[in-house]
Amino acid sequence: DFSFDTKKAKELLNAGFGVVNTHMQDGIIRGNGLLIALNPNASNAYRVLDTKSAQYLSFSKSALSKQAYPSSRMGAMALLRQTYNDATWHAGGNMKNTDLALEALNENKNLTQIFETGNLLDALRADKVGDEFGIQYTIVGSGDEFERISDIKSTNANFIIPINFSKAFDVSNPLLAQQISLRDMRKWNQEPSNLKVLSENGVNFALTTRSLKSVKTFHTNLQKA
């Protein structure tokens, strides 16, 4: 169900955004989303620009699921593979009964496929699954793509990149400072260069406000990058 949030819309408008891509952020195969114009003075009939903006996926099980499976990343990948195989079987007319979920998946196969990942390795895993089934995902990254830029480039995927940078560590207390790993320090230092590294390596990307606690920090972080 879609409900227009006037307050959030005004925040995005003030940050320079006129359109948003939205969907139900729950589950592995999440269905299609909506492309919405941020017009607080119009009705939804005019705001909704596209009722099938893309198909959305992730490796995260639905919060509403009552099943224990999948309980691991490997299990989520296996379930996604099996669903694709079932959808292909269903499309060939091999099932006696109609499966509405598989029908919907097949109907959405020509849409842009946007895969949300939580880290660099998940981005590579998602691309691997897509390659098995001839699907080129657009990947929602995590901002650490610079760590394995050669592997990221080899995916040939378009990326949607957040710019939610880590805060500087408080090292005023020497006991706490000792607990900060060198890896974390390096990541804090280098992650603002992620966009530069992607650009220099010819990786196509767009930016997202996703994961920002406040949309107001978008331009500040962009200037930092």
What do the PLM-derived regions correspond to, one by one?
Residues 85, 95, 103, 124, ...:
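Extracytoplasmic and endomembrane cell-envelope/extracellular-matrix remodeling and assembly machinery
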